[in-house]
């Protein structure tokens, strides 16, 4: 099972780096890959984990003064197919999450 999450964060410089480290910490228990500037493909084992991540991101947004907006797709139990232009190895990491649910 996997889903996609993307966000906008209105912060710059070292503050942005610090906040992005906190986002990575929220995601760290889960296998995930970051593609593009703020686009993640995340593997989860249950819809409960999806909800836990959603609540953690909401809490993160409430705890900071900067604007933080995000979108999470619904959990997908089927193998995913994504298209676009990335480096070849980038697709291997995405497929490891989306194809081998």
Task: Describe every region a protein language model picked out.
Residues 1-2, 36-39:
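Short, surface-exposed beta-edge/turn micro-motifs
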Residues 1-14:
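Short, extreme N-terminal segment that most often corresponds to the first beta-strand
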Residues 5, 40-43:
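Short cationic amphipathic helices and targeting signals
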Residues 20-24, 28-31, 36, 43-101:
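Charged interaction segments
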């Amino acid at each position: 099972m996997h889903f996609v999450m993307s966000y906008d964060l209105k912060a710059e410089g070292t503050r942005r780096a610090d906040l992005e480290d906190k986002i990575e910490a929220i995601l760290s228990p889960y296998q995930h890959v970051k593609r593009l500037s703020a686009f993640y493909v995340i593997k989860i084992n249950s819809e409960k984990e999806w909800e836990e991540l959603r609540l953690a991101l909401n809490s993160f947004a409430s705890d900071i003064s900067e604007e933080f907006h995000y979108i999470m797709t619904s959990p997908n139990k089927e193998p995913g197919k994504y298209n676009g232009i990335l480096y070849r190895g980038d697709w291997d990491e995405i497929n490891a999450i989306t194809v081998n649910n």
